[in-house]
Swiss-Prot record:
Annotated compartments: Cell membrane
Disulfide bonds, paired cysteine numbers: none
PANTHER family (alphabetical): FORMATE DEHYDROGENASE, NITRATE-INDUCIBLE, CYTOCHROME B556 FDN SUBUNIT, NI_FE-HYDROGENASE 2 B-TYPE CYTOCHROME SUBUNIT-RELATED
Protein's name in the database: Protein DVU_0534
Parts of the chain that traverse the membrane: 10-31, 57-78, 89-106, 130-144, 166-191, 199-222, 254-265, 291-306, 316-328, 354-368
Principal subcellular localization: membrane
Family note: Belongs to the NrfD family.
Gene Ontology cellular-component annotations: plasma membrane
Source organism of this protein record: Nitratidesulfovibrio vulgaris (strain ATCC 29579 / DSM 644 / CCUG 34227 / NCIMB 8303 / VKM B-1760 / Hildenborough)
Length: 388
């Protein structure tokens, strides 16, 4: 195992591309906050939410669900064999939620008023208040859950030991808060039955969003672990290397069952609402692509990979699972929203909107690499191996 190599050249193709994206992102950020939202986006009165909400927020929150899924598996359900996956998952979740809040500032007309719902005008009957309160609280919980890695790196043993004793309480808080805001993000669309296509609109949207967040968390842990195993293999210790395949098989099995259940309740929902006739339309074909290609197929591939012990199949299924979550959030927030409007009034993101979203994702990856290459995330600190 090797840690950060300060002698290694920073002028690699990957770092150069990353640097270009970050510089362009900073330029677009300056334009956004000096010229206004209209200068860098195609948002309007018909389409007030674009990819900054549909991708950066809805997808970001869902894909960061690996934090509560992994910590609950290890600390609440006693599956200690997944302990090595907890810190990478918590780190990803913490960065995901942190940059969700960062990205939200781009979408707000008055970014400085972001804390208003918490400290000035609560609006306690609003779902957005509940989402904002839960996300802010859960971000704090994630920071505390992640902090032992930083404290071990800094050598602050006493503070670290105090924080570790709070693990179980923090995990319970994390699961409760995640259940609330993951489902509430789906509930936001309940107020727009005439704007959201019937195949995606349902009174069970909160349930769908929560269950699909579990799929996102399980798939993201496998996907992220596969990337880390390939690109940061030299930073892992023997425990992480030995337990990596077990995490893939265990989470793959769980994802297969959750996806199968999700598929069944989606079919039941369409049946209850008598929406089958919409399948003969273009939107119906797109719904079938989502359900068959990114729900049923990955569920089958997860089951096949686990049964046949084919780790490559499971990793491919995790890619489909992640893409399926992105596709679902895009469909609900963008593609199937305002479906009745003429084509010339529909929303398509400005290239600067896309550029800012790419900047946010690149920032997450860059910060994760910085943390993982210096702090005990992919390995156990030798001074704390017996102090869990």
């Amino acid at each position: 195992m090797q840690h950060a190599n300060t002698n290694k050249s920073l002028m690699t193709p990957g770092n150069i591309i990353t640097g270009i994206i970050l510089v362009m992102g900073l330029v677009l950020t300056v334009l956004r906050f000096t010229k206004g939202i209209g200068a860098v986006s195609n948002l309007d009165d018909n389409n007030p939410w674009g990819i900054w909400i549909g991708f950066d927020l809805l997808c970001g929150v869902a894909l960061a669900a690996g934090g509560y899924v992994t910590s609950a598996s290890c600390y609440l359900f006693g599956m200690k064999r997944y302990h090595s996956a907890v810190r990478p998952a918590i780190t990803t979740a913490f960065l995901g939620y942190f940059f969700v809040v960062v990205a939200l500032n781009y979408d707000l007309g008055h970014p400085l008023r972001l804390p208003y719902p918490l400290v000035y005008s609560q609006g306690t009957t609003s779902l957005l208040f509940e989402v904002g309160l839960c996300v802010a609280t859960y971000l704090t919980v994630l920071f505390v859950e992640w902090s032992p890695a930083a404290l071990e790196w800094l050598g602050l043993r006493k503070i670290r030991n105090v924080v570790v004793k709070l693990t179980l309480v923090l995990t319970i808080f994390g699961v409760v808060l995640s259940t609330l805001h993951q489902s509430s993000l789906g509930a936001l669309f309940l107020i727009a039955p005439s704007k959201l296509h019937p195949l995606w609109y349902s009174s069970f949207l909160p349930v769908f969003f929560f269950i699909s967040s579990m799929v996102a968390g399980l798939s993201m842990v496998i996907f992220e672990g596969s990337l880390a195993h390939k690109g940061m293999h030299h930073m892992m210790d023997e425990t992480h290397l030995k337990e990596a395949d077990g995490v893939v098989f265990g989470f793959g099995k769980a994802a297969s069952f959750v996806l199968a259940g999700y598929f069944m309740i989606k079919v039941i929902d369409v049946t209850m609402d008598n929406d089958w006739h919409y399948l003969a339309t273009g939107y119906g074909a797109w719904w079938l692509v989502e359900m068959l290609g990114f729900v049923a197929l990955p569920s089958f591939l997860y089951a096949l990979g686990v049964r046949e012990k084919r780790i490559g199949v499971i990793r491919f299924a995790s890619v489909l699972g992640v893409l399926g979550i992105v596709m679902n959030r895009f469909n609900v927030c963008l593609v199937a929203f305002n479906w009745q409007l003429p084509a010339d009034q529909r929303y398509f993101p400005h290239w600067m909107e896309i550029g800012i979203s790419v900047f946010i994702v690149t920032s997450i990856i860059t910060v994760y690499r910085f943390i993982a290459s210096r702090m005990p995330v992919l390995y156990e600190h030798p001074d704390y191996k017996d102090a869990h």
